[in-house]
Amino acid sequence: MAKADFYETLGVAKSADEKELKSAFRKLAMKFHPDKNPDDKDAERKFKEINEAYEMLKDPQKRAAYDRYGHAAFEHGGMGGGGGGFAGGGFSDIFEDIFGEMMGGGAARQRSSGGRERGADLRYNMEITLEESFSGKTAQIRVPTSITCDVCTGSGAKPGTQPKNCGTCQGTGRVRAAQGFFSIERTCPTCHGRGQIIPDPCPKCHGQGRVTEERSLSVNIPAGIEDGTRIRLQ
């Protein structure tokens, strides 16, 4: 079976520059990625073709050889072949973007490295009188707040016990899965990106290391505020 033209595979013209190639690859990789198309052999095959086409066309030397000789330039090991995986520098940035969008921005990776997690956004709807909107006021509101558990001091483990390194990911929070001739890094399914497992969870926070409590906040409502106005607190 004849191989598809690399330019046609990516849906770009032969005059496409590096930026156009990268944009086309990223769009198609997102569409046909195995994680978005589980058990779909056609999508997996298409993803491999997209990967191979970009691997060749992003390299100026390989692209020049392909433009001159077509697929024959890579037969019998010429120019290093077409299955070299992610040796080029362009893939790391692109796949980091792709996995970021697919996996919610890499929060699990941040947890496994010990970084502080960003709290969830909260929205509070407040009703005030017409008089208050003219004169302004200071209002007290109560909002749920995530704080460190005072029983386990944030470890998530029952007092007197300790978390253990995850045996699946060896404490990294990430695992690699083979997909044909390339591999994909994913959040560890055992520890969910933490890098640790908790055999004996804390009875108060149930292994989360944090608990939710309400706290009071003062909100200054400025004079002349209009209906639908948003006030942001950080």
UniProtKB/Swiss-Prot annotation:
One of its GO terms (molecular function) is unfolded protein binding. Keywords: Chaperone, Cytoplasm, DNA replication, Metal-binding, Repeat, Stress response, Zinc, Zinc-finger. A zinc finger (CR-type) spans 136-214. The keyword Zinc-finger applies. Zn(2+) 1 binds at residues 149, 152, 202, 205. CXXCXGXG motif repeats lie at residues 149-156, 166-173, 188-195, 202-209. It comes from the Bacteria. One of its GO terms (biological process) is DNA replication. Binds 2 Zn(2+) ions per monomer. Residues 5-70 form the J domain. The keyword Disulfide bond does not apply. Its cofactor is Zn(2+). Zn(2+) 2 binds at residues 166, 169, 188, 191. It is found in: Cytoplasm. Its main location: cytoplasm. InterPro entries: DnaJ_C (IPR002939), DnaJ_domain (IPR001623), DnaJ_domain_CS (IPR018253), HSP40/DnaJ_pept-bd (IPR008971), HSP_DnaJ_Cys-rich_dom (IPR001305), HSP_DnaJ_Cys-rich_dom_sf (IPR036410), J_dom_sf (IPR036869). Participates actively in the response to hyperosmotic and heat shock by preventing the aggregation of stress-denatured proteins and by disaggregating proteins, also in an autonomous, DnaK-independent fashion. Unfolded proteins bind initially to DnaJ; upon interaction with the DnaJ-bound protein, DnaK hydrolyzes its bound ATP, resulting in the formation of a stable complex. GrpE releases ADP from DnaK; ATP binding to DnaK triggers the release of the substrate protein, thus completing the reaction cycle. Homodimer. Belongs to the DnaJ family. This is Chaperone protein DnaJ. The gene is dnaJ.
